[in-house]
Each structure stands twice: as structure tokens, then as C-alpha cells.
UniProtKB/Swiss-Prot annotation:
Biological-process GO terms, alphabetical: proteolysis
CDD domains linked to this entry: Peptidase_C15
Protein name, as recorded: Pyrrolidone-carboxylate peptidase
Source organism: Mycobacterium tuberculosis (strain ATCC 25177 / H37Ra)
EC number: 3.4.19.3
Reaction catalyzed: Release of an N-terminal pyroglutamyl group from a polypeptide, the second amino acid generally not being Pro
InterPro entries, A to Z: Peptidase_C15, Peptidase_C15-like, Peptidase_C15-like_sf, PGP-I_bact-type, PGPEP1_Cys_AS, PGPEP1_Glu_AS
Disulfide bonds: none
Gene name in the database record: pcp
Record-stated family: Belongs to the peptidase C15 family.
SUPFAM superfamilies to which the protein is assigned, alphabetical: Pyrrolidone carboxyl peptidase (pyroglutamate aminopeptidase) (SSF53182)
A single cellular component GO annotation: cytosol
First-listed, main subcellular location of the protein, grouped into a coarse class: cytoplasm
Subunit-level organization: Homotetramer.
């Protein structure tokens, strides 16, 4: 049976509970389209997150890697198309969980400018919508640890020539986090809805390696 590695992050910044962690933990051990899901929570820190994911890939030998993170302010699940070779969290007023602030620094000075996700992004979004979960394609994964890890994993797989497909899914805040005073008005999504959406996305990624060709309606501009 093939395996799917799902990664998530724990709390960070002013986010006391991360939907990526809860969703990853909920999916751990499930079977989706004949594949076993194995979840790992990786450090929400630059570089250590990549090292932890690389170790998990070596141990688990997955056919597919789906990385999860939170994107506050987005009202839908978003499947990322690109990962950039740049880290710039100072503009968010954020440091990683080790207190590190990177401003305009590359993940790998010798690496390419960006990588495309190797999962069928549009097909995954369409599958989520058919499951009743709002979702869209995103062309910008940010410049914090989410984008950093996505780039690092895709770079690692490319450098090693591993036959593993990988992609990133961003989740809205949890309702309990959106209810905090400093987040009032921020969109949110329950863990149950996030799990349903991610499950549909993983199933689509397992069932087809090539993306669908027809366009899908989109409202997200980034």
C-alpha cells in the first residue's frame, strides 16, 4: 500500500492553536484512495522544518507529500501553485518559533527562483469544492515558514531525483482563534471542514498525477 506524508505546524506567533496540526493529527492513520496517511508535526522554524520533513520522507518513503499550514485572513482552503526561494517574515511582524527573523534571504542561495507544486492543483481544488468545501488556487504561499518548507521539500526531491510528488495546502484560522480579540472579523473554518477538504484534495492527487486542463472559476487573486 502506498503512503502519504502529511505535515503540519504547531502554534506560532499569536496563533495559540494551529489548524494544520489538528488537521494533520486527525488524518493520521486514515486510508485515502488505498493509501495510508502518516502525519508528522514539524518545527515552525526556518531550516529545521526542512530537515524534519527530509527525515520523515526518508523514513516513510511516501509517494505523495502534502504539507499543511495556516494562512490567516483567507476564507477558503487554498492549494499553492508556487514556492519561492525567498524568506521575508519581518514584513509580517513575525519571527519563527526559534525567534529567527529573515528579511529577503533565500532558502538556498544556489537554488532556482521558484518551484511549481508537483500535485494536480486545479483538480484538488475542484475535488474540494465538489465535497462542499470552499477552496481556490493560490499563486502566493507567502514568505514565512510555509513557503520556506514547501520550497525546501520540492528542492530536496528535485535534487535527490526522488519520484515523490509534493504540494502545499493552506487552511483558514480555526473559529476559536478567530474569536480572539485581535482576530475579530478574520475568516475561519472548523477542523471537520478542513479535514473533509484536505481528504478530497489528497484523493484527487492520488487518483491523477496530471492536472485537469480546463479552467476553474477563481476569486482569490494571489
Amino acid at each position: 500500500m502506498s503512503k502519504v506524508l502529511v505535515t503540519g505546524f504547531g502554534p506560532y506567533g499569536v496563533t495559540p492553536v494551529n489548524p494544520a496540526q489538528l488537521t494533520a493529527e486527525e488524518l493520521d492513520g486514515r486510508t485515502i484512495a488505498g493509501a495510508t496517511v502518516i502525519s508528522r508535526i514539524v518545527p515552525n522554524t526556518f531550516f529545521e522544518s526542512i530537515a524534519a520533513a527530509q527525515q520523515a520522507i526518508a523514513e516513510i518513503e511516501p509517494a505523495l507529500v502534502i504539507m499543511l499550514g495556516e494562512y490567516p485572513g483567507r476564507s477558503m482552503i487554498t492549494v499553492e501553485r508556487l514556492a519561492q526561494n525567498v524568506n521575508d517574515c519581518g514584513r509580517y511582524g513575525l519571527a519563527d518559533c526559534a525567534g529567527r527573523v529573515l528579511v529577503g534571504e533565500p532558502t538556498d542561495p544556489a537554488g532556482p527562483v521558484a518551484y511549481h507544486a508537483t500535485v494536480p492543483v486545479r483538480a484538488m481544488v475542484l475535488a474540494m469544492r465538489k465535497a462542499g468545501v470552499p477552496a481556490d488556487v493560490s499563486d502566493a504561499a507567502g514568505t514565512f515558514v510555509c513557503n520556506h518548507l514547501m520550497y525546501g521539500v520540492l528542492h530536496h526531491l528535485a535534487q535527490k531525483g526522488l519520484p515523490v510528488r509534493a504540494g502545499w495546502i493552506h487552511l483558514p484560522c480555526l473559529p476559536s482563534v478567530a474569536a480572539l480579540d485581535h482576530n475579530l472579523g478574520v475568516p475561519s473554518m472548523s477542523v471537520q471542514t478542513a479535514v473533509a477538504g484536505v481528504t478530497a484534495g489528497i484523493e484527487a492527487a492520488i487518483r491523477q498525477s496530471a492536472d485537469i486542463r480546463e479552467p476553474i472559476p477563481s476569486r482569490l487573486q494571489i
